[in-house]
């Protein structure tokens, strides 16, 4: 089995998994616990610890996704998409800290999507980074101050 083919299949699986999760979040079809569990499963499949990534500053996140100085587009995209989904889930929830959680997650997602080249994820069936950045900007602007 070619390593590149294996990696591409894993990325495609993650894309499908996260696209389905986005639909469940927007449709209100999952509890917060189920969403968090699926996000952690996706991160683990990608070799990442999402709880750790959520707690990191942008500078530390950069070290996680670019340990040799060059951004790993797969890891960057995965963390960006997970952060975006985290923001969606928080924005649509009724929690007391939901606005702050959504803002933090969307800002993290915007930072990470901004590091990606425009065509980094177009083969995954998910929007390109520029389209995601537009959606994030709209969502950030719609949050109460």
Residue ranges and their predicted role:
Residues 23-33, 88-105:
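Short coil/turn connectors between adjacent alpha-helices in alpha-solenoid helical repeat scaffolds
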Residues 72-97:
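Mid-chain, well-packed structural core segment of small domains
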